[in-house]
């Protein structure tokens, strides 16, 4: 299954409109787009919960939510899971980085001890009502690939439903990941990141259940805005860039304006 990342509710609508089966609420994307900051643990649980609720209000897709390190220790993780589940999360991802965490493709990451990570996953599993729990490890870049594989196995034993080994650097490492445990694995493909970009077909043959493009939509939006706004700045007009810009009607369709037009007519007075 291909899963695009969403940094806001409009992106979630587009993902659903294009026929994808799930959406990923990207912590990096929310931080970049909402705060204009790098992925260095600036988003709060309250802010993340508000974004999840907004996405849930406008899409019926399953939402996989990046909860970073869980906003604290194992006790805090339980609270985080309950809050995000109430907001509409279908699957909640908890990772093993030290707080403040960094983007999985940044240098200088650190991970907590395995036992602390296992405690967080157990707390998440105990706290959830219906949401799946995804365990993500960044250990491959911090300790060793073998340690990352071991953490995947240990979190599966602790009750995790989906496993996510972040940052493999070679095709050979990628191929080894689904062999690590009898569980669904997700692979994150970041354009410009540390992991080689393979096709969905190649990854399915290796045994991956999900392929995540966490910030492809965000990076595409940045590129599009730079091209169009750069053209306007240079020429003083949008002429020549029409193919780069969604039509006014398409914009209104995506935000479901016809539905609200019908409501206005239904509840009109007089």
PLM segments and residue spans:
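Alpha/beta enzyme core
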Residues: 1-213, 220-231, 266-270
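Extended, intrinsically disordered, low-complexity segments
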Residues: 217-270
């Amino acid at each position: 299954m291909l899963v695009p990342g969403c940094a806001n509710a409009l992106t979630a609508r587009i993902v659903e409109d294009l026929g994808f089966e799930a959406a990923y609420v990207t912590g990096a994307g929310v931080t970049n787009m909402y705060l204009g900051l790098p992925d260095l643990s600036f988003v709060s649980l309250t802010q993340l919960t508000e974004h999840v609720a907004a996405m849930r209000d406008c899409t019926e897709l399953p939402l996989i939510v990046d909860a970073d390190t869980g906003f604290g220790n194992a006790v805090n993780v339980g609270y985080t899971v309950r809050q995000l589940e109430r907001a509409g999360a279908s699957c909640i991802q908890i990772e093993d980085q030290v707080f403040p965490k960094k983007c999985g493709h940044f240098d200088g990451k650190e991970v907590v001890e395995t036992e602390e990570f296992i405690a967080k996953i157990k707390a998440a599993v105990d706290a959830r009502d219906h949401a799946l729990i995804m365990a993500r490890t960044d250990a491959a870049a911090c300790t060793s690939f073998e340690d990352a594989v071991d953490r995947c196995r240990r979190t599966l034993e602790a009750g995790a439903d989906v496993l996510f080994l972040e940052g493999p650097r070679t095709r050979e490492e990628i191929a080894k990941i689904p062999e690590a445990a009898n569980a669904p694995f997700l692979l994150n493909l970041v354009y410009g990141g540390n992991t080689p970009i393979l096709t969905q077909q190649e990854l399915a043959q290796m045994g991956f259940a999900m392929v995540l493009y966490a910030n492809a939509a965000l990076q595409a939006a940045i590129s599009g805005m730079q091209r169009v706004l750069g053209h306007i700045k240079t020429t003083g007009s949008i002429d020549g860039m029409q193919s780069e810009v969604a039509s006014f009607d398409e914009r209104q369709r995506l935000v479901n304006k016809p539905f609200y037009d019908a409501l206005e007519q239904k509840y009109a007075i007089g």
